[in-house]
Amino acid sequence: MSTQQTMTVDEHINQLVAKAQVALKEYLKPEYTQEKIDYIVKKASVAALDQHCALAAAAVEETGRGIFEDKATKNIFACEHVTHEMRHAKTVGIINVDPLYGITEIAEPVGVVCGVTPVTNPTSTAIFKSLISIKTRNPIVFSFHPSALKCSIMAAKIVRDAAISAGAPENCIQWIEFGGIEASNKLMNHPGVATILATGGNAMVKAAYSSGKPALGVGAGNVPTYIEKTCNIKQAANDVVMSKSFDNGMICASEQAAIIDKEIYDQVVEEMKTLGAYFINEEEKAKLEKFMFGVNAYSADVNNARLNPKCPGMSPQWFAEQVGIKVPEDCNIICAVCKEVGPNEPLTREKLSPVLAILKAENTQDGIDKAEAMVEFNGRGHSAAIHSNDKAVVEKYALTMKACRILHNTPSSQGGIGSIYNYIWPSFTLGCGSYGGNSVSANVTYHNLLNIKRLADRRNNLQWFRVPPKIFFEPHSIRYLAELKELSKIFIVSDRMMYKLGYVDRVMDVLKRRSNEVEIEIFIDVEPDPSIQTVQKGLAVMNTFGPDNIIAIGGGSAMDAAKIMWLLYEHPEADFFAMKQKFIDLRKRAFKFPTMGKKARLICIPTTSGTGSEVTPFAVISDHETGKKYPLADYSLTPSVAIVDPMFTMSLPKRAIADTGLDVLVHATEAYVSVMANEYTDGLAREAVKLVFENLLKSYNGDLEAREKMHNAATIAGMAFASAFLGMDHSMAHKVGAAFHLPHGRCVAVLLPHVIRYNGQKPRKLAMWPKYNFYKADQRYMELAQMVGLKCNTPAEGVEAFAKACEELMKATETITGFKQANIDEAAWMSKVPEMALLAFEDQCSPANPRVPMVKDMEKILKAAYYPIA
């Protein structure tokens, strides 16, 4: 009694899937090693290869389509090329280990596969899908085309039996025995099926994609081949005739139209005729198109054209007999000259038979346009071929075609399935990508039947320590300007105060002592909190002058402005909008700063002991149009040379000493507790904090040696935060300074005790940075407190002690401890708090803070910071 008589379709499908699930469990057992799987594949492929002729004969006999010899070749291709391509591929367990990046890849089967096969390539497709399923340890259940059922089962049985004999699970390959379309649909929609491997007509492929599960389906092709005037004519004609006649044109990648440049049209046609192509006349064409599509060219019902299902894979002689025309006995393809591509010419549709449309191209663009029209005419995503020796034409063709395989100087049938004429993956399932409504654009192969798991070991982000290549320090170190090589055209960036104090003249005096003559241009219009508008003004002067060195002398404003002028001088295409965007990892930012130093060097000479800009990759620029302050950061902005000469600070007013000195303290403190703090920056940060507590008050009171120490402390802190970055104190201070026009050092100082206490609490929103493997800011504040001699036994005590010590230093230097003391109206301040907090969150300094600075928390800090400390 047959299976069909003893069970329903539902029972049959359930049984097949249940057996496949058992096979899947078997495949997952440890004994199925890579070596065993490869052995099974080898035995199964050889068994199918041994029967390639018998299978070809069975396919031709059952379907009545195609050519025996070509089907035999396709069977060999499925056994040989497909197996060769995956012979050394790892598909079991651990398939790749990358110790450098800490990634281990593990391959697992996707699960039970539903394999759907066509009438056009029944046995070769069954072999192909069976072998790639074995290679990936996936049980497969086939739904064979009813018109090729016997030969397909024959192919699957040969592979299955050989695989089981070699050790494969008993039900590794199965097939539906009855039920037709109903059974096929039930299999595709069965919850036990993991994926669908579908090759066939549009309706079947759409059904696969509608199943609600992953499907590897393909789309229809309408493949053009453009025979361009620079081609090898004999080769092109040979390829087209060979490809189109192969298995009577049943491969979906076969040419459906040849578009020939007018300059070589006659030669190509004659060459094709010598190879067996028969060109029909208009009367014969009318008969053929009527038979194949039910309509005639340019008739009223051309849009109703449908391919006669009897046509695919039939011989030219069969067509001649059906339509009542005569073709030579040795004719291998029928060619029909068409006027255009589209519904008006039915023969420019996909035909899957040895019938080829022929069109003449008036020029290269016309040829490409006609080919594009073919692809767009129900062939999107599949394939397109071109025969040409003009690289520019080939590239233009490839860029134009919405096809996933562009086959160059290649017969498209053999080129499309891969491995013979090129190195495309060998396959009988050709993906068409989104152009054709498919999930894959490549040739489907074993890769597509694997789930790749990735074991990712923890890896710290690469970190960096970068400072200017040359840093000169000690009193009177400005003299190095007379010795530095390659200075001839110097552009000095400064502000009017520096000019009035004679600092610019000091620089010019040293430059004039050089052994070579120098040209000097000065720009002294930099304002506090320099703007992009000022930068553009200075840049215009710089572009006219064309310097080979830029010298910035002054505080942070002059140096920051000079950095951006330098950038735009070397790279006028640089986009300020992109530069100001926030990032988490400097190396992975969305915008890449360009390489600097090709046109000029940047030499920075600080005249205040605070910003550290002379050694950092940062620049803070304001935009008068938006009223916002933007901290820019990239190592491209690191100056070429820093000259840290304390003589420029000896006459600084006390207020500037205090403001800039407290800025140094904040720089060092934030660098030390930053999530990006590291062994290279920690020592610098600690030393800077120590120098500030030992020397700031002395410097404030006029001690010249202490001023030298503070000048060094500023640069040391700059080197620390250049690599460790800053935190939320600076984020908020940037916004306060922009909104109320207060000195930067004063802003960060007022906020510092509040930020220390905030960061010193165990956070509920933890910071994200791989090297920062647990919260430790409270411990680090305690370390700083103990280093400067404060008594504390616990992190909590250390946090409070350090915050109070900072407050005491502020009071000792007569610095405000609340923004109210800056004569800011309380209502005006409070109204700005929400905006300042939000902008502070967007600030580039926020990501390195040791706890995530929540907007609401920053609002609380800003409100509290308005009121002076008692």
Curated annotation (Swiss-Prot):
Cofactor (UniProt): Zn(2+); Fe(2+)
Keyword Hydrolase included in the entry's annotation: no
Protein name according to UniProt: Aldehyde-alcohol dehydrogenase 2
Gene3D superfamilies on file: 3.40.50.1970, Aldehyde Dehydrogenase, Chain A, domain 1 (3.40.605.10), Aldehyde Dehydrogenase, Chain A, domain 2 (3.40.309.10), Dehydroquinate synthase-like - alpha domain (1.20.1090.10)
GO molecular function: acetaldehyde dehydrogenase (acetylating) activity; alcohol dehydrogenase (NAD+) activity; collagen binding; fibronectin binding; laminin binding; metal ion binding
UniProt-annotated catalytic positions: 252
Gene source species: Entamoeba histolytica (strain ATCC 30459 / HM-1:IMSS / ABRM)
UniProt cofactor note: Zinc or iron.
Keywords in alphabetical order: Iron, Multifunctional enzyme, NAD, Oxidoreductase
EC number(s) reported in the record: 1.1.1.1, 1.2.1.10
Highest taxon of the lineage: Eukaryota
